[in-house]
Amino acid sequence: MAEIIKSVISNVLTAFYQPFWFALLLAALFMLAYKAYPSAKDAARRWVEWFKTDSSFRKIFLLAFYTALILFRTLLNRNIWANPLSDVMGKWWLYTPDGKLTTEMIENFLLFMPFTAILFWCFRDKLLGGWVTFFKTLWCAVKTVFLFSFTIEMLQLVLRLGTWQLSDLFYNILGGAVGGIIYFIAYKIKHIKK
């Protein structure tokens, strides 16, 4: 009987804990919108108007949307781990030592590639300044993705959501660097045509 009660309590607390951070974030954003526009109809009308007319609004919306996808994948929708340091090295190849296929390295690589390109697209002047060079773009991409990814890994460690892994950090940074290179190439092509 004690095991059943323990299991029920554990399952109920886990069911509330898993969506807690997402619910908190969503509630905070809702309250900001509510205080700015108490009328839902007016808020929706203004949002659609901004989306149609303001390109920077669309860019930042895309960045916020993609950042939310990353956070939901890495932090907000994770199970609690008893030992977040159980696999510090992580997975470095497509197959685990027992021969099972894993796509973690590909997911981590692809997760940050668009993020960096979108981030530079939104904040090029603030991040890269007026003169965009290859090494400046690459360094800024690596530095930014390292800080963001390291923060996610540390939050996974502290909050016990997932495992802290060096391979995640490496492939996130590699994906971010490739995203920075893709942004640089697109930027140069766009400015050569002008």
Could you tell me what each predicted segment is?
Residues 1-161, 166, 177-194:
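Bulky hydrophobic segments
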